[in-house]
Amino acid sequence: MAQTQADTAARKPVGQSVSATRRVSRLRRHARLRKKIAGTPERPRLVVNRSARHIHVQLVNDENGTTVAAASSIEDDVRSLQGDKKARSVRVGQLIAERAKAAGIDSVVFDRGGYTYGGRIAALADAARENGLQF
């Protein structure tokens, strides 16, 4: 019994890769979160962006669409730090807290970017809190 091309196409699994599914899920979580929070000049949004190797954080004023302060694990003083990615995330949290204080900001709205609150995200948030930022 010969298979037709339609039969062969019907048997192929349809779907996305696991990484694509995770990325889409994260973007959906972030969209839900963004509907609820917004940054103001007095209380900007602390946005976290994580990659496999680095972590970036920004203080964003959504009314103007401007970045008030930023910190990243790509910076030289963080790159030279010995330790794992979590230790670098802690240092980035300390840097953003220092830069927020220098800009006159004491309180922020935390935007975890759709990432689960744990690991590097939690380490960054805890370090920022310990250095004086109010969430």
Swiss-Prot record:
| Stated family | Belongs to the universal ribosomal protein uL18 family.
Q: Which NCBIfam families match?
A: L18_bact (TIGR00060)
The segment annotated Disordered runs over 1-23
The protein in question is named Large ribosomal subunit protein uL18
State the GO CC annotations.
cytosolic large ribosomal subunit
Q: Which GO terms describe its molecular function?
A: 5S rRNA binding; structural constituent of ribosome
One GO biological process term is: translation
Its source organism is Mycolicibacterium paratuberculosis (strain ATCC BAA-968 / K-10)
Q: What InterPro entries is this protein classified in?
A: Ribosomal_uL18_bac-type (IPR004389), Ribosomal_uL18_bac/euk (IPR005484)
Keyword Flavoprotein in the entry? The reply is no
The record's keywords, sorted A to Z, are: Ribonucleoprotein, Ribosomal protein, RNA-binding, rRNA-binding
> Subunit structure of this entry?
Part of the 50S ribosomal subunit; part of the 5S rRNA/L5/L18/L25 subcomplex. Contacts the 5S and 23S rRNAs.
| Function of the molecule | This is one of the proteins that bind and probably mediate the attachment of the 5S RNA into the large ribosomal subunit, where it forms part of the central protuberance.
Highest taxon of source: Bacteria
